Amino acid sequence: MKIIIILFVTLVSLSAYSEYTVDQETINFDSNGVSIAYTVAGEENATPVLMVMGLMASHRLWGEYLVNGLVDAGYKVILFDNRDTGDSENLDRLGKPRIYWKFALSYMGIGFSAPYTLEDMAADGIRVLDELDIDNAHIVGASMGGMIAQTIASSYPERTKSLVSIMSTSGARHLPEMSRQNQDNFSGVGELDSEQVHAYGFYPEAMGRQLTAILQAGDRSEQIKTITVPTLIQHGIDDTLLPVEHGKHTAELIQGSEIIIYDGMGHNLPDEVVPNVLSDMLSFFDR
C-alpha cells in the first residue's frame, strides 16, 4: 500500500543518523498511563536540551556526532522515545486506525479523533522534564519531532528556553506536497526485516496511530503564531518529503525566528551537514 511505503521511506530517510547508544541506562516511567523511556548524557547541572525524534524513530537515530557535540559543548542532553516507539510502550491496545479514511476526512477538512495526539506526545516530553526536576530546556525536534517541539513551545512556553525545529512543518494546506520524483522512488522500497524493526525501535501497527495524530492536528499555523520563545528553523534545500517551503512558512509564522537552509540536506541529517547543523545550533543557544 502506498501509505505504508511512504511511511517506511520517511523512517528510512532518517537512517543517515548513525546509531548512538548512550552509556547511561534507559529509564522508563509512567506518563499518564503510558510507559515512556528516556536516557541522559552530559553533566548533571549542565543546561538541558530535550531532543524529540520523528515518526517511528528511536532516540538512537539522533546520531553520535550531534549528541556528543552537544555534550562536549557543555549541555545535558535528554533523549526520549515517543510513545509507540523504541523503548517506550507499544500501544497496539489502542487499535489500528483506518488511515485512508482519516486521510479522506483530513482532505475534506472534517475533524476526527485520534488514538493519541501531538499534544499527548508533547505532554510526554514535559513529563520527562518533570521526572528530572528540570524547570525548562532547549527543545529540539526533527520532522514529526519538530511538530511536537513546536507544540511544547506553544503550550508550555515557561518550560521552553528555545525551540529548534528541524525539517518540520506547520501543516498548512497550501504548502507543496512531496516531489513526484520522491513518490516515484517509493516503488523500489522493500519491507522491513526483523533486524531492522528492532534496530529502529519500530512497531509496525503504530505507524497509523502516529500519522493519525499528525493528520488530526491539521494546519497548526494559528498555534505556531503564538510561539514567543527564541526559535531556529533548520531545513534542507533538497528535502523532497517536506520541501523547504514548509520550513520557510514556519519561520514566517514565528515572530523574530531565524531560518537556516542547508545545501546537501534532504529529509535527513547527512554526516557532511551535521557539523554545520550543530555549529549553528550551538551559536543559537549561546545568544
Annotate the PLM regions.
Residues 34-103:
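Conserved HGGG/HGGXW glycine-rich cap/lid loop of the alpha/beta-hydrolase fold
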Residues 109-115, 119-137:
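Conserved acidic catalytic loop of the alpha/beta-hydrolase fold
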Residues 147-154, 163-190:
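Flexible "cap/lid" loop of the alpha/beta hydrolase fold
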Residues 206-223:
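Active-site nucleophile elbow and catalytic-triad environment of alpha/beta-hydrolase enzymes
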Residues 227, 233-235:
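Short beta-strand/loop motif that positions the catalytic acidic residue
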Residues 229, 243-250:
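Short alpha-helix in the alpha/beta-hydrolase fold that links the catalytic acid
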Residues 238-242:
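Acidic catalytic loop of the alpha/beta-hydrolase fold
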Residues 257, 261-287:
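Catalytic active-site module of serine/aspartate enzymes centered on a nucleophile-bearing elbow/loop
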